[in-house]
């Protein structure tokens, strides 16, 4: 249920796409990499730190957040391979597309919605993206 709510909240209004020339991809990709590394070690408290204040407020505890990721985004919890694709700006929001190969070899693409809090980038939501020609 939380996954559906989370995906719905962040899927609304993301229609247009433009180049994200104002964003530096390095701190953004490091944030995502660090969260994925924390998930791989089952360090949900550390993974929770990379979530935005809104997401932390939605889930309340690292344990509930970790459970949501394990159940709703298992490819993020235990990826076999992670590749960073395009960084862009949509409707004024910074979106990093990530391709993940899961333990069974299946490819998944996800859009990570990023926000800057002070000098730090945080993950403000993740939405799965349909890959053309896969699973059709």
Regions found by a protein language model. Give the residues of each.
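Residue-level detector of flexible, active-site-proximal loop/helix-junction positions
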Residues: 11, 54, 130
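Sec/Tat signal peptide C-region and signal peptidase I cleavage site
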Residues: 16-20
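Exposed beta-sheet edge and beta->alpha loop/turn motif
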Residues: 86-136
């Amino acid at each position: 249920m939380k996954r559906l709510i989370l995906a719905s909240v962040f899927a609304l209004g993301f229609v247009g796409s433009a180049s994200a020339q104002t964003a530096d991809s390095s701190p953004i990709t490091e944030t995502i990499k660090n969260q994925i590394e924390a998930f791989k070690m089952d360090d949900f408290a550390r993974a929770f730190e990379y979530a935005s204040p809104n997401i932390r407020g939605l889930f309340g505890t690292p344990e509930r957040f970790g459970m949501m990721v394990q159940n709703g985004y298992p490819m993020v919890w235990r990826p076999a391979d992670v590749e960073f694709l395009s960084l862009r700006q949509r409707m004024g929001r910074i979106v990093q597309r990530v391709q993940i190969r899961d333990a069974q070899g299946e490819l998944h693409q996800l859009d990570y919605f990023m926000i800057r809090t002070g000098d730090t980038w945080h993950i403000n939501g993740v939405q799965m993206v349909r890959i053309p020609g896969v699973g059709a």
